[in-house]
Amino acid sequence: MYDADEDMQYDEDDDEITPDLWQEACWIVISSYFDEKGLVRQQLDSFDEFIQMSVQRIVEDAPPIDLQAEAQHASGEVEEPPRYLLKFEQIYLSKPTHWERDGAPSPMMPNEARLRNLTYSAPLYVDITKTVIKEGEEQLQTQHQKTFIGKIPIMLRSTYCLLNGLTDRDLCELNECPLDPGGYFIINGSEKVLIAQEKMATNTVYVFAKKDSKYAYTGECRSCLENSSRPTSTIWVSMLARGGQGAKKSAIGQRIVATLPYIKQEVPIIIVFRALGFVSDRDILEHIIYDFEDPEMMEMVKPSLDEAFVIQEQNVALNFIGSRGAKPGVTKEKRIKYAKEVLQKEMLPHVGVSDFCETKKAYFLGYMVHRLLLAALGRRELDDRDHYGNKRLDLAGPLLAFLFRGMFKNLLKEVRIYAQKFIDRGKDFNLELAIKTRIISDGLKYSLATGNWGDQKKAHQARAGVSQVLNRLTFASTLSHLRRLNSPIGRDGKLAKPRQLHNTLWGMVCPAETPEGHAVGLVKNLALMAYISVGSQPSPILEFLEEWSMENLEEISPAAIADATKIFVNGCWVGIHKDPEQLMNTLRKLRRQMDIIVSEVSMIRDIREREIRIYTDAGRICRPLLIVEKQKLLLKKRHIDQLKEREYNNYSWQDLVASGVVEYIDTLEEETVMLAMTPDDLQEKEVAYCSTYTHCEIHPSMILGVCASIIPFPDHNQSPRNTYQSAMGKQAMGVYITNFHVRMDTLAHVLYYPQKPLVTTRSMEYLRFRELPAGINSIVAIASYTGYNQEDSVIMNRSAVDRGFFRSVFYRSYKEQESKKGFDQEEVFEKPTRETCQGMRHAIYDKLDDDGLIAPGVRVSGDDVIIGKTVTLPENEDELESTNRRYTKRDCSTFLRTSETGIVDQVMVTLNQEGYKFCKIRVRSVRIPQIGDKFASRHGQKGTCGIQYRQEDMPFTCEGITPDIIINPHAIPSRMTIGHLIECLQGKVSANKGEIGDATPFNDAVNVQKISNLLSDYGYHLRGNEVLYNGFTGRKITSQIFIGPTYYQRLKHMVDDKIHSRARGPIQILNRQPMEGRSRDGGLRFGEMERDCQIAHGAAQFLRERLFEASDPYQVHVCNLCGIMAIANTRTHTYECRGCRNKTQISLVRMPYACKLLFQELMSMSIAPRMMSV
C-alpha cells in the first residue's frame, strides 16, 4: 500500500480536481456509493447485525437454568436430590426452509412465500449443555447439539436470504425482480417493512429549563445498559424554583434534589452523595465544583449543603433513601440493603452495576449537578430536545433484538416449568419436548404481522404501527417506504416544535418529503446519502484511550479536573486528558485509516466546555463528506480515474473510505466541522470567506430524499409544492416492479406506455426512475381554451387517449382457502347448487367451472361469483330422525366487488401452510382516462380531466403540433412553481437536441438564460411561446401561448373507483338508517350543516323528507294518558297501555326510528320521556 503512495508523490498540483471537472467527478463518487450501498443498506446492515451479533449475545447473556427437585421425605435418611444445569450456547441459523405437511423440507424462495401466503423464515438451532450434578458422583455432561428453538423471519436481500449475491439472470429465473431493493420481510404472504423509530439518546445528560413547575431547571439522564433487556432507568437532578410551591420558608436559595428510580420522593442531592460514601462536605464539593476559586457556583450549592446538614453518616443517608422506597423494609438493615441495591443496580446503570463503582457514579452525578449549575448561572446553553444529535433511530436490528430478548426469556421460563414437573416426580426430562418452538416463531410473526411491537398478551402497552405493509404503488413509493422514519409522539398533540424542520436535519433527512395533515413533520424520510450506524463495541476505543495517557477517574485528584478535558464514551464519563488536541488528531487519523476505530464512530470535541465525546452506539444518523486538508480536497484525480474503471479494477466506495478521502460524519460531529458547499469555495480568492475548511459536500442535491429527487428544478419551486409532489409521486402509476405479471398483489396499477422523462435529475439514475418510470412526456399548453379547464382541471386530447395516452390496467386479487372448522364442518371449493345450498345470492353462478373456480379469460362484472365455496351444515339432533334434509350445505362464495368489471387474468391453485387447498384469482380491467380522473405534473400541480376534445378541435401550431393537455394559466402565478415552466423549456430543447435534459437542483451550469439561448438556436421563441390556431375556427389565437413537453403523471384516484349513488339499499340493524360507504352501497349523509342550511331556507317539508321519510320512518303507538309507548298488535287491532289499564285512548305517532330508540334507551336508564299527544 505504501509503495503506491510513494509513486504518487509527483507534482501534487496536476492531480487536483478542477472545478469544471468536478461537475462530473462528484457524480462518479456518488455512483460508486450507490453501487456499493444501494438505497436500503441501513435496513440490511441493521438486520445482519441482529442475526450475527445480537441473537448470540442474548442467548449467551441468559443465565443457565438451575433446577433441583424438592427433597422427598422418604422413610429413613433424606438424600440430596440431583441438580440439573442447562446452558444455551452457540446458535446456528439455517437457510430459509419450508416443511410441507408430509415433513419434507425444501428451500423456500421468496416468491413462493408470497404466492402461497407463507412466512419467509429460517430455522434457528442452538447447542445446549445439560449438566447433572449428583452428590458424591462426578457431574455428568451431555451436549444436545443443534436443537431447534424457533424460526426467525428473514429480511429479503440480507446476508441470510437466498437471493443474496445472485446475478440478475438468476433472480429472473426465480421470478424475482432484479431492481427490487429488498429490506422487507414476508409474513403470511404479505410484505412488511419495519419503520425506523425515533427516540431520545440514552446515557447522555440533558439540561432543560422548566416552565410553570416547582423546578427552575432539570437535568436528566436516561440510563441504559448496553445490550441488556433492562428497561431504561432515568435519573433527574432538579433545581427548585425560587418561591416555588415546594420551597420551604426556612430554606434560603434554591435547593437541588434528585429523583431516583424506585424511590417515591425526591432526595436532596447531598444525601445521595453521602449514601455513595462521600461524607465530608469538601469531598462532595470536589466532585461537583472542580474549581474552588468559583464563588458563584459555591454559593449555588450552599442551600443544598445546609439542608443535608442533619445527615452526616453513610448509613443514615442510606436509611433516609431506603425509607422512601416503594415498599420500605421493616428493619433498618433491610432499608439500608434496599437503598444500596437501588444505588448500585438502578441508579446510572450504564456507569456500572458491579460493586465498587461508587467513585465513578459520584463523579457522574457530580457532573450532572455541575451541568445544572452551569445552566442556572447562564454559562452554558440549555439542550435542545429536537436536535437530531440527541436522537437515535431504532431500525430492524434493535427492534427485533428487543422482541427476541422477551421471547427467549419466555422460552426459558417454559422450559424451566416443564422440566421442574418431571424432576419433582424423580424422572429425567426430554429437552426437545421441553422447548416450545412456537414461542419465538409466533411471537416474532405476530409483531411483524400486526405492527404491535411487544408481547401479544400486553397488546395495549405495545407500540403500534412499527411494521407496515410495503407500499407497492410505484417503485418510488416502495423505496421511500423503506427509508421512512417515525417519531412516536401522539399525532393529536398540537406541538409545533417537534414537527418543524430543524437545522441539524441538513443532509440527513429530506426537507420536502413529509405527509400533509396530522402527521406532518413527525413522519420523515432519509436523505439519499444518509446512513444509520449499526453500532460497534466501545472496548477497543477504551483500550486505546488507556494507552494514550488518559487518566482514569479512580486515579485522579478532583482538583485536576478543572484544567483537563473530560472524555465521554457513549455518554459515560471514562476519564480526563491533558492534551485534547493531539488526542483528537490521533483518533481522527485512526478512523480514517480504519485502524482500531470503525468508520461510523463519531468524535466530538467541545472546546468551550472542555469535553471530548465519542459515540459508537447504534442508531446515529450520519452521511459521507469529502475531507479537506490545507484548503485542498484529499480526493484527487487518480481516485476518480480509478473509480471510472471500477468494473475492471474492483476499486469501490469502500476503498475511498479506507484511503481516508471520505468519512462519515454524524449530526453532532457536523457541528464541529467547517463545511464547504462546493470545491469552488476552496479556491483561493481575494476575499476568502474562510480559510479553515475541514470538509466539503459531495453534492448539495443529496440533501433531498427519494421522492423529492424526482422533481426537476426543485430549487425553483415554492417549498410546499415540493412537499405536495413528494406525496403525489407515490400515487403515480407506472411499472411498480418488473415481475408484476407473476405476482398476485391485492391492488396493482400498471401504465400501458410509461416513458422516461425528457428532463431528469442526476439522482434519478440511482432511484431507477428511467428503468421503471411513472408518467408520460406530454405536450402541454398553458392556455384558457373554451373554459373547461377552470379551477385546476385540464383539457385532454381525445384522439391521444384513443391511441393509448395514459391508458392503464388495474389488477385486483381475491384469495380464498378451504379449511376444516369442526369435525363435521368443512369448507370445500365447488359449484354450489340451488337444491342443496342454503343462502345463495341472486348472482350468476354459471361462470364457475366444476371445481368451483372461474376460468381465466372469462369476463366478469359486479357481484359475479368468482370462487364457489360451500360449508357443510352441522347436523342437529332433531334432524337425524327425518331422513330428507333439504339443505346440507351453506354457500360462502367470493363475489367480485360490486362496482368493478374486468376479465379473469390468472388463477392460481396451491396448498397453504396447513396443507389445505388455497387459491388466488387476479382480475384485470383496463382504465382509459376519462373526465374526472386525476393527473399531475412533477411540481405539485394536480388537476382533474375537465373535458376531452378530439384532435381536430384542439389548437395547433404552425408545425401542426397539437397539445395533449391544456392547463389553465391561473395555476401558475399564485403557486410560484417556476420549475414547471423551466422544465417545459428544457423539455423543448431536449426534444430538439435529442438528448436528455439535466434539471438537477443547485446546479449552476444550467440556468434559464442558457436554456432560452439554446431554444432560440433551434428557431423557437426564446421563452417557449408559440402562435396557436383555434381548432374550432382555424383562426389565429390573438395571444402567444406557452407550449412544450412536460412530464405528467396519472394518479391512482379515478372516477370509476369513486362514483357512487343510491336510491334504496341496505340499512343498519340498530337504528334502521342507511349504511355508510360506497362498498356497502350506503347512503349520503345529510349532516348537521346541511340541516342548518335548510332551516335557514325555511324548506320545512324538504327537511322532513330528508331527515325522516327518506331515512328511518317508523310508527309508534302512544298512550294519551301517560305518554309512554303502548303495546300494539296491528294484526288483531288490539292496543293497550298496561300502566294506565287503558285500551281505548291510544294514538298513532310517526317518528324517526332513531328517536324511538333513544327514548327506549333513556327508559332503560330510568328516565321517562313522555310524548303527550295534543
Swiss-Prot record:
Binding annotation for RNA: 731, 841, 890, 942
Residue positions binding Mg(2+): 792
Entry EC no(s): 2.7.7.6, 3.1.13.-, 2.7.7.48
Binding residues for DNA template strand: 456, 1078, 1085
Cofactor: how and how many bound: Two Mg(2+) ions are coordinated by both the catalytic residues and the nucleic acid substrate to enhance substrate recognition and catalytic efficiency.
Major subcellular location class: nucleus
Keyword set, alphabetical order: DNA-directed RNA polymerase, Hydrolase, Magnesium, Metal-binding, Methylation, Nucleotidyltransferase, Nucleus, Phosphoprotein, RNA-directed RNA polymerase, Transcription, Transferase, Zinc, Zinc-finger
Superkingdom: Eukaryota
InterPro entries per UniProt: DNA-dir_RNA_pol_su2 (IPR015712), DNA-dir_RNAP_su2_dom (IPR007120), DNA-dir_RNAP_su2_hyb_sf (IPR037033), RNA_pol_bsu_CS (IPR007121), RNA_pol_bsu_protrusion (IPR007644), RNA_pol_Rpb2_2 (IPR007642), RNA_pol_Rpb2_2_sf (IPR037034), RNA_pol_Rpb2_3 (IPR007645)
Activity regulation as described: Pol II enzymatic activities are inhibited by alpha-amanitin. 3'->5' exonuclease activity is stimulated by TFIIS, whereas pyrophosphorolysis is enhanced by TFIIF.
Any one GO MF annotation of this record: RNA binding
Subcellular location: Nucleus
Residue intervals passing through the bilayer: none
Annotated family: Belongs to the RNA polymerase beta chain family.
Biological role stated in the UniProt entry: Catalytic core component of RNA polymerase II (Pol II), a DNA-dependent RNA polymerase which synthesizes mRNA precursors and many functional non-coding RNAs using the four ribonucleoside triphosphates as substrates. Pol II-mediated transcription cycle proceeds through transcription initiation, transcription elongation and transcription termination stages. RNA-dependent RNA polymerase that catalyzes the extension of a non-coding RNA (ncRNA) at the 3'-end using the four ribonucleoside triphosphates as substrates. An internal ncRNA sequence near the 3'-end serves as a template in a single-round Pol II-mediated RNA polymerization reaction. May decrease the stability of ncRNAs that repress Pol II-mediated gene transcription.
Subunit (UniProt): Component of the RNA polymerase II (Pol II) core complex consisting of 12 subunits: a ten-subunit catalytic core composed of POLR2A/RPB1, POLR2B/RPB2, POLR2C/RPB3, POLR2I/RPB9, POLR2J/RPB11, POLR2E/RPABC1, POLR2F/RPABC2, POLR2H/RPABC3, POLR2K/RPABC4 and POLR2L/RPABC5 and a mobile stalk composed of two subunits POLR2D/RPB4 and POLR2G/RPB7, protruding from the core and functioning primarily in transcription initiation. Part of Pol II(G) complex, in which Pol II core associates with an additional subunit POLR2M; unlike conventional Pol II, Pol II(G) functions as a transcriptional repressor.
Official protein name in the record: DNA-directed RNA polymerase II subunit RPB2
UniProt organism field: Homo sapiens (Human)
Gene this chain is encoded by: POLR2B
